[in-house]
Regions:
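Conserved HGGG/HGGXW glycine-rich cap/lid loop of the alpha/beta-hydrolase fold
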Residues: 1-38
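Conserved acidic catalytic loop of the alpha/beta-hydrolase fold
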Residues: 49-67
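Conserved alpha/beta-hydrolase catalytic His-Asp/Glu region
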Residues: 128-190
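Residue in the alpha/beta-hydrolase core beta-strand immediately N-terminal to the catalytic nucleophile
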Residues: 30, 68, 90-92
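Flexible "cap/lid" loop of the alpha/beta hydrolase fold
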Residues: 88-126
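Conserved loop-alpha-helix segment in the C-terminal half of the alpha/beta-hydrolase fold
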Residues: 18, 191-231
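Catalytic active-site module of serine/aspartate enzymes centered on a nucleophile-bearing elbow/loop
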Residues: 220-274
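Gly/Ala-rich beta-loop-alpha elbow adjacent to hydrolase catalytic centers
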Residues: 71, 75, 79
Length: 274
């Protein structure tokens, strides 16, 4: 199961989807509150716990007891939450969110970052399809989240921008970040029993490794940590081959049943889109 980041949608995985689908059955949902996905309840707080509840419900609907999870940013945090609940056979966490601690200033910094990004995209939204035709424009537009935005196709670039502008929970989530709410950090990591690969992009400008990886490296049992050389926060576009290689190694190396998965439900995956 592939879990995208905040303000994105399932299509962010395009660079690696074909290779993964050729090897596995893949679930690539758009998460609640994001463009093309189910709604996020208006009366619920924006937290990793609530977002993970929604993914668990999807797993139950599909008859999936446990799965291999790949998550980027917010999706990486959700993948770790699912691992805590015993729903993961393995996890590949690409620049996972939630590794900061309340009071260290990172929540408000990230909230301000997304507020600026969305404001900029809203200003140019009407012309996104036209201006994203130029490689130089794509590199400039995505410089905060990837090193090589010019590698994104014009159609995908427009879709990424549209997803950010159309994210229904963006303002609520930004307010939660600015308020430094505890529900946006992840604790109790010692409950994780499955293999976890923590992949930290070398040039992450959203969740810089030196500030966001250390707690995960310390607290996730037997975590394997690697650095994604030459990559930014969304590494699937900067180096799709490297990310695919790491996923295949992690999944193929952990094909046994999850010890925590419900025994009465066969673990499987199902191809799914939005």
């Amino acid at each position: 199961m592939l879990l995208h980041g905040f303000t994105a949608a399932w299509g962010i995985w395009h660079p690696i989807l074909a290779d993964l689908v050729a090897r596995y059955e893949v679930i690539a949902p758009t998460l609640p509150g994001h463009l093309g996905g189910p709604s996020y309840p208006a009366d619920e707080l924006i937290t990793f716990e609530r977002s993970t509840d929604a993914v668990e419900r999807l797993l139950d609907e599909l008859g999936v007891g446990a799965a291999h999870f790949v998550g980027n940013s917010m999706g990486g945090g959700i993948a770790l939450e699912l691992a805590k609940r015993g729903r993961a056979r393995s996890v590949v966490a690409l620049a996972p969110a939630g590794g900061w601690t309340c009071g260290d200033g990172e929540g408000p910094r990230i909230g301000n970052f997304f507020a600026r990004q969305i404001k900029m995209l809203e200003r140019t939204h009407a012309w996104s399809e036209r201006i994203m035709r130029r490689p130089g424009t794509r590199r400039l537009a995505f410089r905060e989240i990837m090193r090589h935005g010019e590698l994104v196709s014009p159609a995908d670039a427009a879709s990424i921008s549209q997803a950010a502008v159309g994210c229904a929970i963006s303002r609520r989530a930004i307010q939660a970040l600015l308020a430094d709410e505890v529900g946006l950090t992840i604790g109790d990591l010692d409950r994780i029993t499955c293999p976890v690969l923590l992949a930290t992009p070398q040039f992450d400008r959203v969740l810089p490794g030196p500030r966001h990886a250390p707690r995960y490296r310390r607290e996730i049992p037997a975590v394997r940590a690697v650095t994604l050389s030459g990559c930014g926060h969304v590494p699937v576009w900067d180096d799709a081959k490297l990310v695919t290689k790491l996923i295949v190694e992690q999944v193929d190396g952990n094909l046994g049943p999850s010890p925590d998965a419900p025994s009465d439900v066969q673990s499987q995956s199902a191809a799914a889109g939005p």
